Design a protein with these regions (language model features):
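DUTPase catalytic domain/fold
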Residues: 1-147
């Protein structure tokens, strides 16, 4: 599949896979000034790009493991979803779970984007609970299999 990318910020690099078999495309911050994120706080960070996904695909925005491990930085609405019909700037909602302020600098790799196929369900209402498919688990919820 082809991912079309339009650079809103011509100075920043295109997003890219950082290894031959990486599933995530690294996204870069596109900020004029450094952005500080205090512990427990979050900020929307622009990437300076918009994307054109083919119909039947989505892009999921996910945290970078190195930022999570070293600084407690994550994508707050992880995974963030970019629908195939969205053409605005890709922005990442970063959250600081760390103990120190975290500074986002221009062109810093801040998140990764994974492209996935989308299956759209046909939604059918049933009249009675007994019309639902039965399973061994049935309605067992949180913690029903133990800790």
């Amino acid at each position: 599949m082809i991912l079309k990318v339009y650079k809103l910020n011509k100075n920043n690099p295109l997003p890219d896979y950082m290894s031959h078999q990486a599933s995530g495309i690294d996204l870069f911050a596109s900020v004029e000034n450094d952005v500080s994120i205090a512990p427990g706080d979050y900020r929307i960070i622009p990437t300076g790009i918009s994307v054109s996904l083919p119909q039947g695909y989505e892009a999921q925005l996910r945290p970078r493991s190195g930022l999570a491990l070293k600084h407690g930085i994550t994508v707050l609405n992880s995974p963030g979803t970019i629908d195939a019909d969205y053409r605005g700037e890709v922005k990442v909602l970063l959250m600081n779970h760390g103990k120190k302020p975290f500074v986002v600098k221009n062109m810093m790799r801040i998140a990764q984007m994974v492209i996935s196929e989308v299956v759209r369900a046909r939604i059918i209402e049933v009249d009675e609970e007994k019309q639902m498919d039965k399973t061994k688990r049935d309605n067992g919820g949180f913690g029903h299999t133990g800790v």
